[in-house]
Amino acid sequence: MHRVPRLTTPWANRDLQRAWEKTYQDHRKKVQNAQPLVDTHPPQIYSHLCLKFKKLKMEEERLSIIDRNNYLLLQRVASAMKTRGQTDGRNNFTQRRS
């Protein structure tokens, strides 16, 4: 039995070798220039879902009530300071005779 000489390259001739190498180089360029197909961006954030407008409105109303009460308290303290905090301790009550 005679052995068939094996080629060191799998190509039978140079034209086939060039075609294989060109195809391989084209494949490598495509792999190198490939763009990802998976969308890795975070989802859009909708402001009307993140901001609770009803809650903000309720908080604003609560703060306006607090501001009004603070203003009234300030007026009372200012009037007390103006009169030096004096109170009328006199009792002008006259007893009735029965």
Swiss-Prot record:
InterPro entries: CFAP97D1/2, Hmw/CFAP97. Expressed in a number of tissues including brain, thymus, lung, heart, liver, spleen, kidney and testis. It comes from the Eukaryota. Pfam families: Hmw_CFAP97. PANTHER family: CFAP97 DOMAIN CONTAINING 2 (PTHR33768:SF7), MIP11318P (PTHR33768). Belongs to the CFAP97 family. This is Uncharacterized protein CFAP97D2. It comes from Mus musculus (Mouse). The lineage of its organism: Eukaryota, Metazoa, Chordata, Craniata, Vertebrata.
